[in-house]
Structures are given as C-alpha cells and as structure tokens.
Amino acid sequence: CLARHRVKATFFCTANFALHAKDLILDIQKGGHEIASHGFYHSSFETADLRKSKEALEELTGQPVNGFRMARMMPGEEEEIHKAGYLYNSSLNPTCIPGRYNHLGQPRTYFMKDGVLQLPASVTPIVRFPLFWLAYHNLPASLYRKLALWTWKEDGYFLTYFHPWEFTSL
C-alpha cells in the first residue's frame, strides 16, 4: 500500500522484534523506509536499552538509526536519548489522555529540546484532539480525514502512528 502511493514511512521497531524478524526488517528497509528504535523490549525499559537497541538495529540494517520512540509514548530522558546518539525523539503525544499523561504544556509541533529534535504526534489545533491510531479506528472516516487535513494545513505536516497488529485480523 505504501509503495503504491509512493509514501515513505518510519518503522519504529523494538530490537528484540527486529532480531527475530530480520528478513522483514530488511525488506522494509529495501522499500526505502527508515528503521528507527522503539527500545529493546516493548514491555520493559532501562536507560541502557537506548544505546543497546540503536546498536542492534544499526548492525542489522547497516544504516544509522537516528530516531527513537518510547513504548506507549511515555516520556524519556532527553539527555540520555541525546547521549545514545539519536537525532530525534517522537515519543510525545502533546495532548491529555486521562490516566496516561498530560502534555498540554508541551509544544504541539516540532521543537528542539536538549539537542534532540522533538517530533510530536499530530493533534488538532486549538483543542489538541489526538489523531493517533485509536482515533483512526474509532472516529467516522470522514471526520478523521477532515481533522487530519485541518492539522496538516495548519502545521505543514501530519504525523501519526500505527502498530503492525492493526493490519491483521486477530
């Protein structure tokens, strides 16, 4: 589907998954897509995993790994992300999700923090309605499209994310 529409994407992969699905990761890379880090494991995180996952993905792909996204879009220590060698972090969802996080005080669009480019997930202007996978699956398609286009026109880009399991029948 991406190739048909000439769309390039970033695939944030845990190193553990990549090491168990090497051929898939290399096929994604051959399609011209970026491979970025989603940590070593999705279920647990240690600061050492920042560097460890980056190195494992770089060894597998033979390419630099520049991006990081924390599992569950939880906050990370920017200084540690920078020290591990990442150029950008896409872990911020600049909205309020009760019981999860409140990032209403953070910028809605890209910004620099502690030497790392921050690429937040897109949220609508004004009310900061999150336009991530959950909205995509639960809003009427026409409404999601209108909100996404409004955000794209306002911000000059649109950044959303999906998980591989969303494209399979479970």
Task: Show where each model-derived region lies.
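Acidic-and-aromatic substrate-binding clefts and catalytic sites of carbohydrate-active enzymes
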Residues: 10-22, 41-48, 69-76, 96-101
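Histidine-centered catalytic micro-motifs
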Residues: 35-41
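An active-site-proximal "capping" alpha-helix that borders the catalytic cofactor pocket
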Residues: 48-59
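Active-site-adjacent pocket scaffolds in enzyme catalytic domains
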Residues: 58-59, 63-161
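Short, solvent-exposed beta-strand-terminating loops
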Residues: 163-170
